[in-house]
């Protein structure tokens, strides 16, 4: 066998690192999606096509030099769509998506409206059928169990386990899926 190692891409040219995959890395077919920084647009969503060795920035979610840090709290593939946490700099960390079949990227939900972030998936993320379950903070009820139905694009709080503004932190210490029961 030919055991060799090579640099695939110099995303942040010069001596500085691009920190590829620091927050997320997901393979979809021949394409690897990951977080990286080119030194001018912060940590953003990038891709590398292994079939033709091309590398490109998929989305500059937080335009300018700031970082969106895609996948810092969560990243999961559902069909052809990547779901991940990211910040655009004005709404804090929220749930975002990228459709790999048509290259569109969008904020799925602004769970904690305003400049605060809901930090989706900080404690858990689990897919049951077409529904993504995750922890999030809406700014009023603390970290609770939330869901996003990928088939109809609806997002809702499943339960206020620790009623009031306290945090139940679902999934912080354990998450188990048995059949379709979380």
Predicted regions mapped to residue ranges:
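Feature 14080 marks short, conserved micro-sites in well-ordered regions
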Residues: 1-182
């Amino acid at each position: 066998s030919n055991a060799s190692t090579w640099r695939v891409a110099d995303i942040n040219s010069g001596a500085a690192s691009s920190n590829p995959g620091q927050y997320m890395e997901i393979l979809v077919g021949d394409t690897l999606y990951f977080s990286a920084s080119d030194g001018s647009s912060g940590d953003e969503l990038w891709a590398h096509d292994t079939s033709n060795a091309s590398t490109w920035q998929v989305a500059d979610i937080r335009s300018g030099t700031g970082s969106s840090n895609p996948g810092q709290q969560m990243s999961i593939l559902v069909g052809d769509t990547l779901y991940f946490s990211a910040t655009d700099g004005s709404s804090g960390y929220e749930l975002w998506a990228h459709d790999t079949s048509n290259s569109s990227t969008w904020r799925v939900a602004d769970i904690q409206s305003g400049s605060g972030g809901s930090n989706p998936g900080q404690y858990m993320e689990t897919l049951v059928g077409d529904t993504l379950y995750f922890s999030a903070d809406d700014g009023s009820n603390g970290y609770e169990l939330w869901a996003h139905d990928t088939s109809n694009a609806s997002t809702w709080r499943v339960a206020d386990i620790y009623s009031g503004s306290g945090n139940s932190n679902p999934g912080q210490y354990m998450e188990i899926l048995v059949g379709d029961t979380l």
